[in-house]
UniProtKB/Swiss-Prot annotation:
Homodimer. Catalyzes the reversible interconversion of serine and glycine with tetrahydrofolate (THF) serving as the one-carbon carrier. This reaction serves as the major source of one-carbon groups required for the biosynthesis of purines, thymidylate, methionine, and other important biomolecules. Also exhibits THF-independent aldolase activity toward beta-hydroxyamino acids, producing glycine and aldehydes, via a retro-aldol mechanism. The gene is glyA. One of its GO terms (molecular function) is glycine hydroxymethyltransferase activity. One of its GO terms (cellular component) is cytosol. The modification N6-(pyridoxal phosphate)lysine is found at residue 228. (6S)-5,6,7,8-tetrahydrofolate binds at residues 119, 123-125, 351-353. NCBIfam families: PRK00011.1 (NF000586). PROSITE patterns: SHMT. This is Serine hydroxymethyltransferase. GO terms for biological process: glycine biosynthetic process from serine; tetrahydrofolate interconversion. The keyword Transferase applies. The lineage of its organism: Bacteria, Bacillati, Bacillota, Clostridia, Eubacteriales.
Amino acid sequence: MDFTNLKNTDPELLDMIKKEEERQEYNIELIASENFTSLSVMEAMGSLLTNKYAEGYPHKRYYGGCEFVDEVEDLARERLKKLFAAEHANVQPHSGSQANMAVYMSVLQTGDTILGMDLSHGGHLTHGSPVNFSGKLYNFISYGVDKETETIDYEKLKKIALENRPKMIVSGASAYPRIIDFQKIREICDEIDAYMMVDMAHIAGLVATGLHPSPVPYADFVTTTTHKTLRGPRGGAILCKEKYAKAVDKAIFPGIQGGPLMHTIAAKAVCFGEALREDYKEYMQQVVKNTKVLGEELKNYGFRLISGGTDNHLLLIDLTNKNITGKDAEKLLDSVGITVNKNTIPFETLSPFITSGIRIGTPAVTTRGFKEEEMKKIAYFMNYSIEHREENLSQIKEQIKEICKKYPLYQNA
């Protein structure tokens, strides 16, 4: 990208950006929630739309001069509705967490009971963690996975729901490698007359391309981020049934946000447009293929995969049998140029700052052009680094750098 002005006005900051640019260029990015946006997304993000205040919604703003940003937001909303066949869309949430907060606030009262997936079983902070606003403002009860299969125990979920009769059931996860049965959860919600919310932040790209069943026909509310598998700018969005549209929109503005970030909404419109193209479907198909191959190769090296494998874009790995913690594995792999994150596993025995596992995913490396052969090499690099962690691993670091050079991040930047 062109940094001519920044070079002249703030070389100190530019130096930091350049160092991060180099890190992204020469590291294998396996954090499941990260991806690389297109240059078009970044151009929209860096546009003069950042100058415009636009409190309110298109054609009902509290400021003048909004006729063109109205067009931008309308375009983003229409593309998002088309992408997921939804009745209503709100593209103003600054993040997935704020999208979730707005849904809770739209139909619930403080102190209401909500059923959400346990964080250590693959849920998310905003699904009821006691350190998060969700756990502080609402009475969250957790469900999780079966100890044997390590997949969601729907019978137990139903039992907990019948015993506690929550006002809402939240599904979706941040570290769950299997298909989620939204129809089954809808049936449980209907039995207890509860709202159904799905946080599809991680799997939105899979849903958009038919690689994971869509929650939209079943859920009252669906939230997502725009920067994971959707490959857009950092931000959030909400889809809902038309009957909840006013309540959701009011919860975002004036409920928890003021002016929307119009440059980000423009970038969201770009990413939704990209996701509607055929080449995006091919990309997501390759993500799933890559994840399966990476998982099988790691199993061949003796790594234990939670639930035995994957149906989506991520793998959750139990490192107990490798005699290394998630924290140490993250640091070790980072030293050779592979970026992962430590992650709790179901029925975790260690602290969330240490963890028994790591979470990895293939969306970012697939964006670069990595395919099955590269997945086999990544599995080899990971295994070799962990098995020979007391040795000099400079040759692995060099091999990783060479692979990254073959697949430059932004060839035309």
